[in-house]
């Protein structure tokens, strides 16, 4: 068979590329190849699972915009495909004055990027997490965690349901 597109690599990037291509071009023959016996066995399967809100990116930058869109689209995909995730937020802690100054900068950056964030003093930090020692920090409410291997498997399922061809154990 001749394919219009062949995507090599069954991690989250390869899988999401194949799935997006199939959504945009349903008439095209698309093949996803993965050398391992399961999807997302390497980097995707070994990351921390954080759905990043974009705390560190310059206001108005493409990275900031993509993070904002990515949080929403990742959670929407999870909701639509019964993939559990935890919108637990992310706590960044300052342990000295210099880091506390950086927290203020990050807090401002988050506000400019329209990220829901809370600036915490030492008492607020301690009440949120009694085992943390710090001068303060920020709590990024939009951050979440998910098992990206589960996301990957569901995405491959959607890709195949749309007529895509996905093959494991292929080099």
For each feature predicted by the language model, list its residue ranges.
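Beta1/beta-strand and adjacent pyrophosphate-binding region of the FAD-binding site
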Residues: 1-13, 31
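Gly/Ala-rich phosphate-binding loop of Rossmann-like dinucleotide-binding domains
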Residues: 18, 22, 158
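Glycine-rich FAD pyrophosphate-binding loop
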Residues: 22-46
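Short loop/edge segments at beta-strand edges and connector loops
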Residues: 34, 87, 121-122, 168-170
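Helical element adjacent to the flavin cofactor pocket in flavoenzyme catalytic cores
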Residues: 138-171
């Amino acid at each position: 068979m001749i394919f219009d597109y062949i995507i090599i690599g069954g991690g989250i990037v390869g899988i999401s590329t194949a799935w997006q291509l199939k959504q945009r071009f349903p008439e095209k023959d698309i093949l996803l190849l993965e050398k391992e016996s399961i999807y997302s066995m390497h980097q995707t399967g070994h990351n921390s699972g954080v759905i990043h809100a974009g705390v560190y990116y310059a206001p108005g930058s493409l990275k900031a915009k993509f993070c904002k869109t990515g949080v929403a689209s990742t959670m929407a995909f999870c909701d639509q495909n019964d993939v559990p995730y935890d919108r637990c937020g992310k706590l960044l802690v300052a342990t000295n004055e210099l880091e506390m100054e950086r927290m203020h900068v990050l807090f401002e950056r988050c506000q400019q990027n329209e990220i829901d964030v809370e600036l915490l003093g030492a008492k607020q930090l301690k009440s949120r997490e009694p085992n943390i020692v710090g001068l303060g920090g920020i709590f990024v409410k939009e951050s979440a965690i998910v098992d990206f291997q589960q996301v990957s498997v569901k995405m491959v399922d959607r890709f195949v349901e749309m007529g895509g061809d996905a093959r494991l154990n292929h080099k």
